[in-house]
């Protein structure tokens, strides 16, 4: 009986550790996903950049929609500084029909996304990263050819009202990296809609 309890506890601990997700300082998981233009985009495509702003987002979530223009602005303001945005839709479109590839393509065209919008069809990427909400940001830093997590969490400190933002977490983290410092804070709580997963 004690053995069974111990085995169950150990299995639970392993599952919890596997689901803990990436933390600042961890190596980022490589990915290769289909963009709305039909081409595959890989993390390795950005090996010449200083970093990548990976944003797990989606179509219907009110929080994701509230952040849409801010995500576009991040790309426009920081892509030329070596930190482009890569957006990834992690939702299972059988559960969230607004997140089909066709709907993603439609939205990207309508909103004029200047960055890739990728579909995590198998949902392996968001699970590997540990994303829980949309939007959920993983700011990656290129460390000698290896992408490491420099910051993870929210874009800023006011999800629904941009005019009331007082702290821009992602921008501050990028500025810290550009000045040779470590982001502080390096993690915050991502506020948004829970990712829709079949499992």
Indicate where each model-derived feature is located:
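Short active-site neighborhood of thiol/selenol oxidoreductases, capturing the structured segment around
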Residues: 44-62, 174
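Short, internal strand/loop/helix patches
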Residues: 105-146
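Structural microenvironment flanking redox-active thiols in thiol-disulfide oxidoreductases
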Residues: 65-110, 121-128
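Short, thiol/selenol-centered motifs that function as redox-active sites or metal-ligating centers
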Residues: 58-67, 137, 193-196
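Thiol-/selenol-based redox modules, centered on thioredoxin-like
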Residues: 139-199
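N-terminal "domain-start" segment that seeds a small globular fold
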Residues: 18-44
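Bacterial Sec-dependent N-terminal signal peptides
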Residues: 1-23
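Loop/turn elements at helix/coil->beta-strand transitions in domains of secreted/extracellular proteins
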Residues: 49-52, 80-85, 112-116, 134
């Amino acid at each position: 009986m004690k053995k069974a309890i111990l085995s169950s506890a150990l299995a639970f601990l392993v599952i919890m550790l596997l689901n803990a997700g990436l933390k600042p300082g961890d190596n980022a998981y490589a990915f290769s996903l289909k963009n709305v233009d039909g081409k595959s985009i890989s993390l390795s495509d950005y090996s010449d950049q200083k970093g990548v702003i990976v944003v797990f987002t989606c179509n219907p979530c009110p929080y994701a929609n509230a952040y849409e223009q801010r995500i576009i602005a991040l790309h426009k303001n920081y892509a030329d500084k070596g930190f482009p945005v890569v957006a990834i839709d992690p939702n299972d479109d059988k559960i969230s029909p607004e997140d089909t590839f066709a709907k993603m393509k439609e939205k990207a065209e309508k909103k004029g996304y200047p960055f890739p919008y990728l579909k995590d069809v198998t949902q392996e990427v968001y699970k590997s990263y540990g994303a829980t909400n949309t939007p959920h940001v993983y700011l990656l830093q290129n460390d000698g050819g290896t992408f490491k997590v420099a910051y993870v969490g929210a874009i800023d400190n006011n999800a629904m009202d941009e005019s009331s933002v007082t702290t821009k977490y992602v921008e501050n983290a990028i500025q810290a990296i550009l000045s040779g410092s470590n982001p502080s804070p390096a993690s915050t709580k991502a506020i948004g809609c829970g990712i829709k997963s079949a499992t």
